[in-house]
Amino acid sequence: MKKIFGFRSKGPSPLGPSARPRSNCVGFGRESASGSHVPRYHIHDKDMGKIHKAASVGDVAKVQHILILGKSGVNDRDKKDRTALHLACAYGHPEVVTLLVERKCEIDARDSESSTALIKAVQCQEEECAAILLDHGADPNVMDSSGNTALHYAVYSENTSMAAKLLAHNANIEAKNKDDLTPMLLAVKENKQHIVEFLVKKKASIHAVDQLGSNRQMFEYDGKRLQRSENSNPVDNGSEDGSLTRSYNTPGPADSWPTSDEEDYNFDNKNVPKINLTELWTAAQQSRKNQTKCGFEELDNGARFDDSDSPSESEDAIEVEPAPSVRVQTLSPSRQSPDPVEGATELAIEGEENGTDVIESASQEQPNHDNLTRADGWHKSNKSEMMSALGLGEDEDEDSPWDSESISESVSLKDVGHFSGTADQTGKRRAHGQIEDVTYIPSCMSGSRNFKMAKLEESRNVGLPVAHMEAPRKYVIMEPTIERRAPVLNKTETVGMTDAQTFKSEPESVSREEQTRLSGSEDSQQKVEEKRKYKNNEAEPSGNLYSGAADGGADVKPQSGDTENQQSPREGSEGRGSGPALLMKEAKKMENEKWVSREPARTAMSERTGLPTGGWPQMQDGSCWSDTDQSEARPTKKTSSKHNKDSGQTAAVDNLDDFTESSETASEDHELQGPDSESILCAIEHLRLECKDTASLLKIRDAVYSYKRLIELKRSHCELLTGKLKRMENKYKGLQKEMSETEEVKSRLEHEKVGWEQELCRLRFALKQEEEKRRSADQLSEKTMEQLRRKGEQCQSEVEARQQLEASLRTLEMELKTVKSHLNQVLEERNETQRQLSREQNARMLQDGILASHLCKQKEIEMTQKKMTSEVSVSHEKEKDLLHKNQRLQDEVAVLRLEMDTIKSHNQEKEKRYLEDIKIANEKNDNLQRMVKLNMLSSKLDNEKQNKERLETDVESFRSRLASALHDHAEIQTAKRDLEIAFQRARDEWFRVKDKMNFDMSNLRDNNEVLSQQLSKTERKLNSLEIEFHHTKDELREKTLALKHAQRDLSQTQCQMKEVEHMFQDEQGKVSKFMGKQESIEERLAQLQSENTLLRQQLDDAANKAESKDKTIVNIQDQFQDVLTRFQAESQRHSLRLEDRNQELVSECSHLRERLCQYENEKAEREVVVRQLQQELADTLKKQSMSEASLEVSSRYRSNLEEEARDLKKKLGQLRSQLQEARDQHREAVHHAEKMEDHLQKLELEKSKFEITIKKQSEEIDQLQENLSRVNLSEEDKEKLQKLTELKESLECTVDQEQKRSSALEKELMRTIQKKCGKLEKNKKQLEQEVVNLRSHMEKNMVEHSQAQQYAREVEERARQDLVEKLKQVNLFLQAQAASQESLEQLRENSNASVRSQMELRIKDLESQLYRMKAQEDFDKIELEKYKQLYQEEFRARKSLSSKLNKTSEKLEEASSKLLLEEQQNRSLLSTLSTRPVVECPCVGSLHNSLVFNRTLIPRENIVVPTSGLQPSNKRVEIYLTKMHQELEKSINRELKEATAELESEFCRVSPLGSATKASQDQLSDASQEFIDILKKKYMI
């Protein structure tokens, strides 16, 4: 029962071996669920390191301490390849996870099972850890060893929130594991409905396919196709009787086949609908009423449901249990108890545990197109009632997806029976008892919607006979039950593709059977016998058929199992006239005979009717038709008339033996025998002889008809199968084509891969060559960079030394502060102890004073006695001296002595009395003291209670303060962490800067490479130009040769002509020859002279170029020296700025120290006042003082931490500023290096040009020398050649000198660059050392902090012990002097209260005063800053205005002087014009003045001006002068405006500090001088 109603089978888990069931962890794998493996790790101390132990326990502080000390890294692994992150996620420690993630651990690290930390977090259902990992970029699509992702585990654990987070972080919803299961398939397989709906909402693919290719969408598609086929057929209202039970048994969507292979063994009870038996009973009654309304009345023997049947039915159900077959009964509405279901399910479980493949048989019919349902209308009317009673919806009457799929695949025998309303009750019971193997239990009857079906095979051989399959298959076949139980009929595999699958009933035959059975006439029996004979003659080849069709018998379905035989279909009810009493007798006979069979009801009926038991089960063996019978769809004719009754009976017995055979032989045989006709004939003869009942004859007839119908159905089914085979063949061919195409594509890809690999090899070789070139360039650049770094380090070494000194001074000051604070604490504790000692001493002094007073009294008494004795002795002496006087007085002395004795005795008695009185008084005093002590103690108790209450309130307040202090401490720790993170970020920034430097170097290298490429290109161009030059030279030579040849030809012709005319003109020829020679010589001389002039010009050009080159070299040197001087000046300025800044910092530090001293003095004064007050309040506020001391320690610790944090921030700011300065210096050095490289390249280019020109000149000189050697030169020409050679040698010397200078400059540049690089490298190393020192300082501070805490704890413990001891002593002393201190305590309390109130008021006043003072100081500072700004602005405005005024005044003076000069000049010009008649056009002003207007007046011609035209010329001159005045004024105004704008911009750039007044004045004077110089240059003022 447990396995059917929701418990899982012992099948394998759908996911990998890393997952197992656990209380709070998700586990699943390929191994069994009872495995020992757990998703959480098994921890062994030997396997793990320190950080792994701390992470598994969740000790954040320990993990942080280990990481700070560097004992182990963040990504260290243990012996099982687990990181600390794995363990923290597996055991759910989010704080450790955040710490490790912030330390930039490897998030996607894998353990030995190749699972990441995210997978472990999801598997162990640690949502917080998984969220942290996802937020920090963990990959949700990583697979473990079994191919499962984190989403698989989230789906398996039904954790929708985790799945939503994973999908939000781009998890692959279609990821497949090694079993080809997506998360959707896994959810469906594990029957997790909630997560399936969630995945469908998230748009998961419903068309996913697993390893076996099964797909739920196929079932839905086939179900839709079946609905179309059913809707296409018309429905007859007359077929209600046949479809009566189908309304109960139609499976709904929930009864469909499982969607995965795991559901074959998975019996979950998650969605189990509860069955309401009262609703079932009411639905059954309603169905009976509807049946009677439709006109179907049952007979008294079999139609009425009596209560007497229920015990017999239950007995039948109980008798079946020990049988090896599995039978599941449906619930009966008459018996409202699910006992038969439980028994049946137990049997079903036994079959599953034995490994049997359960095949459920269901009686279903396959009618032709013309045979339709009769009770369809009644079924529609009662559909909602029955479904609601069974716990199903209205949709459950629809076809299941499995029905449509199994249509074309079922090849089993099916008998179309007639379900009549007058069915026999015994027949019903017998039909129900003939369920073979396991009947299908729908969700409404079995108690579970998720009752898992049998497994589908790859070929989808659903419903095929066992004989045609190589291995046993699992099928689900549904059956109708015709008892008083709730009838349930499921449509399954045997439903046709286009036919409406209903049970067929024949009301006419039913009515005939009723008439013949009731009347009992022999005529009807004879007719039946004749019909039977006719049938035996016609339908001989039909096998053992199912004769229960009249009672709504079921279809014949082949069953298979490992331990089950192939069973015959369920037979229909036999005799119509049998009553319930006979059925009870038969059941008792079965119990007495202990007849163990799978169909007890059928055997009982066969015994009653005399039918041999082997006659009917023959169909069980022959239920799987042979291949020949299926293909031909016709029976093989066999003669049955030759056999006798005995042979028929023996055949029936043999058939029964075949029926009880094991299914193993049936599953092994591939071809079974077809239906045997002899069994049918024997049954007919047996019925004819022994059972003269019309109902049995009618059953035989109906069986024959149903056999014929089955043959027709098999034909259609075979046609469907052939069509499906053809489709499968076409699919197979298409797949083969696709495979061939894929293979071709693979081959192409491989060829392409080979080609790409070859190209890669080539590219790698080329890259290697390029890398070698780059290495050579990198080495050069590295050398230059090293030199620059060295120079930068030298510059920064001094700065770092100063900073280190400042840091050491700060650390020393901090240490002094901490030591002072500790000393103050120790002094306060000592003062408290001294106060307590002084109090004790005062008490003791009081006691000593009392004792001293008593002793003084006693001493006074003794002194009086001594005086008396001394007086007596004096009197005796006097008596000796004055015997004569004493003799008189001896009597008196004796009397006095007697009196003295009496007095002494009286005194002694008085003393005794006084002592007694004193004792009594002491006793009374003791009693009184006791009473007083009791009163004091009671009052003390009251006071202590009050004090306790006060202290409790104080403790609560202190707790709140402690909580706030702890919160502050936590904030400080977070601030510390933030500082560490900031430090790490600074370090990362430093590394980034380093990377940028490297990147800049790589860019420089690339630039060098580009420049080298450009040089190579220019060299190529030069080579090409040289080649062209050589070609042109060759062409010129060829042309000269051609000219020479032409000249030779001409000379030859001339010679010939001359020889011809030699006879006539000898003399003329000679003269012409001499003349020609002279002309040629002259021409050659002219050519030589022109060439000499050209050479001179070239030499002059070369000399000019050399001079220009010298000038450029000098300019470059000057520029380089200027750059060096600027760099030195900048370094000096930087050093001066640093010194000024250091001085300012020192002054600020001194000022801060003074303020600290003032604060400390104020604190000391306040502490003196507070101590004076605390001395009076010490007795009542001891505990309060302890708590305040602890709070003060925490506050001091907090202040120390804050100061340390500030120092660290300052140091970080300094480091950042240093880094920025180093970057700026590095950039400047790189910029200078680039400039120098550019200059060097330019020099090299000029050098190459000069070399080319020198080569050309040398070549030309050589040519000239050759030409001159040919021609006989004169002495002047020789001298010229010598001069040329000397010039050539001088030029070569100058070129050598220039080369030497350029090499020297290059060396100097390299040296400077190397120095700068060295400085930069030193600065970098010093920065790294500072970082290391800071780290060590942080660690030392941590250690010192821990030591200080330990010391503080020890001091507190000692102080507590001392205080406890002293308190004990004080308590004892107070007990002794309680009475004397009552008044003092009251007075003290009053005084303390008054003093407290006064002190509190005073403290508040002081605090308010301090706050006011601070506010006033802040306000004063703000106002001072405002006034300073205003003053500076006014000062600047005044300066600008004064400068403007001065400039304008100067310019006005200059303009006035100019005007005076111009007026004088004009007067002189007018005087000259008036005197001279011929006037030249005046060039107004000098050439320098013409620069103002950028134009010059060129005198044209001498203009003759008459005397009469003097007045208009004077007017023109005046007009011209006025124009000049206007233009001068305009230009002056422009220059003034520009000067004022420049000055204002310069003043804006000046720093706003008030200390820069002198510098601003200097700048103003410089600017004014520059402006005056400009005006002088432009206007010659």
UniProtKB/Swiss-Prot annotation:
This is Ankyrin repeat domain-containing protein 26. Interacts with TRIO. Interacts with GPS2. Interacts with CCDC85B. Interacts with HMMR. Residues 308-319 have a biased composition (Acidic residues). SMART domains: ANK. Residues 229-250, 327-337, 491-504 have a biased composition (Polar residues). It is found in: Cytoplasm, Cytosol. GO terms for biological process: ERK1 and ERK2 cascade; fat cell differentiation; glucose homeostasis; insulin receptor signaling pathway; negative regulation of ERK1 and ERK2 cascade; negative regulation of fat cell differentiation; negative regulation of insulin receptor signaling pathway; negative regulation of multicellular organism growth. Gene3D superfamilies: Ankyrin repeat-containing domain. The modification Phosphoserine is found at residues 13, 239, 260, 511. It comes from Mus musculus (Mouse). Residues 1-22, 225-270, 299-343, 361-381, 488-652 are annotated as: Disordered. It holds the Pfam family CCDC144C.
